[in-house]
């Protein structure tokens, strides 16, 4: 039987470690990590490069999903980052600045669970702890792609997956 765990998040700096509340015999095993998909769509080329701002504004949306693989305690967790680079930050007077590029990165990993893990701890392990391992390489792929597309690399801060998971759960209630 396949179980799916899903959450949608957006970002702020990292904080709490969910694994602190687990028995010491329990653990999250990190397997392979891989780039699932990558796409970038640069708007209005080559004209977009004529008046390129020194530091475009970036808007991001982050999705985290997890699914069990077969009957084993093995899961695929995917971190999807969708970003848009804007000419400038939106303001009240100009809420829709010109889009320079649209980027989508899906970075995934295989994770195993060992030991006696309470059922209510599985979801936070998959949607909080696992994405913490996936975010640094996903961010690196994203920054390199933006740079290779001819734009200045944005400054992307770590995401607090625990806070965002809790916020999403509160919205669902």
Curated annotation (Swiss-Prot):
It is found in: Cytoplasm. Keywords: Chaperone, Cytoplasm, Protein transport, Translocation, Transport. One of its GO terms (biological process) is protein tetramerization. One of its GO terms (molecular function) is unfolded protein binding. The keyword Transport applies. GO terms for cellular component: cytoplasm. Signal peptide: none annotated. The keyword DNA damage does not apply. Belongs to the SecB family. One of the proteins required for the normal export of preproteins out of the cell cytoplasm. It is a molecular chaperone that binds to a subset of precursor proteins, maintaining them in a translocation-competent state. It also specifically binds to its receptor SecA. This is Protein-export protein SecB 2. It comes from Gluconobacter oxydans (strain 621H) (Gluconobacter suboxydans). The lineage of its organism: Bacteria, Pseudomonadati, Pseudomonadota, Alphaproteobacteria, Acetobacterales.
């Amino acid at each position: 039987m396949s179980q799916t765990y899903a959450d949608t998040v957006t970002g702020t700096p990292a904080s709490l470690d969910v694994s602190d509340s687990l028995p010491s015999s329990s653990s999250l095993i990190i397997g392979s990590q891989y780039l699932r998909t990558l796409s970038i769509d640069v708007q209005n080329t080559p004209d977009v490069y004529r008046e390129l701002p020194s530091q475009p504004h970036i808007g991001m949306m982050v999705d985290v999903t997890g699914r069990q693989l077969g009957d084993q305690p093995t899961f695929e967790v995917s971190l999807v980052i969708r970003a848009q680079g804007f000419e400038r930050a939106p303001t009240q007077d100009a809420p829709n600045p010109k889009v320079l590029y649209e980027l989508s990165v899906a970075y995934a990993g295989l994770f195993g669970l060992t030991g006696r893990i309470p059922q209510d701890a599985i979801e936070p392990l998959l949607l909080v702890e696992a994405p913490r391992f996936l975010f640094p390489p996903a961010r690196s792929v994203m920054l390199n792609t933006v740079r290779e597309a001819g734009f200045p690399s944005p400054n992307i801060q770590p995401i607090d997956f625990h806070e965002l998971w809790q916020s999403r759960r509160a919205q669902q209630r």
